[in-house]
């Protein structure tokens, strides 16, 4: 099933948090890279891997998933985001995000907005960590997660491929 063939909402509904499935996808990715390495080595074709850059700051998660106990807290976050988020004091926004993340530490949307708060404070190191956590916990992983980037780095090293770290060049 291809996303372009489906209604957007239907496509998003098909994505659910499934750590087992995620590990299987990562294993398949590793195996695909290994097979590419064998074929390119046999054909004496050089390989250049490019670590993909991503827009951390201006691209929220495609899908976040709330779990049962955190539902009311997450609803408060959703209401706050829809009703004058930036008109609220930074301390209030941070407290709400901390409450959400305490209840649901893997809630990507809260991690993303926590990054926005860190940015607003000028704490760019913690902002980058929060934004990356939002990518890593995105239910619809259309951007490279840390584990995907690590797999690429490992294979570049293992098979002596050239590696371009595009994010570090930006």
Q: Predicted segment positions?
A:
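Serine-dependent acyl-ester chemistry module
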Residues: 4-154, 158-159, 166-170
